[in-house]
Amino acid sequence: RMMDGSKFDRDAWNVRFVQRNITPWFTELELRYGQSKIDHVMDTYSMRYLSMMGNQVKKAMNPKRETNTGHLKATFDWPDINLQTGIDYMRDKHLSRMEMNGEGYRHKPYQPQQNFTQWGGFVEGAWTASDSRKFISGYRYDEVKAEYDTLIANNPNKHHTYGLHSGFFRLEEEINGIKYYAGVGIAERAPDYWERGASQVLDKEQNRQIDTGLMWKIDTFDFSVSLFGSDVRDFIMLERVGKDVSARNIKATRLGGEIEGKWKFARHWEIGSSLAYTYGKNRTDDRPLAQTPPLEWKNSLTWDNETLSAGVLWRVVSAQKRYATGQGNIIGQDIGASAGFGTLSFNTGWKINKYATLQGGIDNLFNKSYAEFVSKGADPSAGLQTVRVNEPGRQYWLRLQVQF
């Protein structure tokens, strides 16, 4: 990131209304409305030293965001058929003020940056054709109107309207205790605030994906396999060259899958293991797709008698040698290959009563030094070469959850 987050103020509220069993077939009407406000400060001096030898500048930014959301959904049930339909609304406004060379920012007024208005409608239906076969399908349309408040009125890039179509079809079938599924879908999204900040001429992103898998449960054993393949047209990719960040649309391919198994080998005891891998390619540049995680293997052992619980997790991640330096997304960009690592964690819990649960644990038990491949990069504005940032060492944590 170009700056460090030094102060954060977040406020949010939501209201929800639900009416059930309106008629024998009109089973539920749900209405939600909410608002969130984010006001935070990012700077180059609160959490780092400024060197007089470098090209660092003492500066700060105070962005502010207000988001209003609405959701209305109706659910209908007939014999063997479930139908859900509704509309969504979002109003998103971004403002900011900043300081350069230490003159301060609190006395300055906020300046509008970008604003978004989104309306959407959706419908999803499920048909239980038999005890072993089910069809699910859905469609959604959104219209997103985006505006650059900083551009003059007659600038051709000031206003953008994105019409977004998404839909899917899925088949689920159970044969001899094994549940199979297969699906195909298309999803479109508009560039967000940060992507539009890097380029004013981005097209909407479209992901065409197929997925399939199976789930098998027999006695004390659970097993599942899932596979997917996607063709992403106009994938929105951010690219960093020095201090400059730009965004463009590319063609991308993603393939991946996960295998998972669990075995309850004794009363209260369970052992589990999973293996996941994703392959990504940037077809436009004929190179690996940035920010694609490497092969990961997880193994767990848990004990739980519904009052007390304990468990260990062994996580093994392979080295990632498929990377695209400088390319990625708003979270981070690739900076080179990463080494493999393994970590061990321990956790325990006590269900005090039906309202409260106390949990605690130790992450990275052996205090290993390691870094994730998909992680935030360092700050080039500080005059430093971008390096991979290690994850925390041994961590102790305690959490109390109370529900009413």
Describe the function of each predicted region.
Residues 1-3, 41-50, 55, 95-104, ...:
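Outer-membrane beta-barrel translocator domains and adjoining extracellular loop/strand segments
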Residues 9-174, 179-183, 221-227, 270-272:
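Face-selective signature of the C-terminal outer-membrane beta-barrel domain
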Residues 15-19, 70-76, 121-127, 169-173, ...:
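Residues on the lipid-exposed face of transmembrane beta-strands in outer-membrane beta-barrel proteins
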Residues 25-46, 172-189, 204-257, 262-264, ...:
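Membrane-embedded beta-barrel scaffold of Gram-negative outer-membrane proteins
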Residues 35-39, 78-80, 89-95, 141-147, ...:
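Transmembrane beta-strands of outer-membrane beta-barrel pores
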Residues 127-136, 142-144, 222, 227-231, ...:
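Gram-negative outer-membrane beta-barrel transporters
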Residues 231-233, 318-325, 349-404:
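C-terminal beta-signal and adjacent terminal beta-strands/loops
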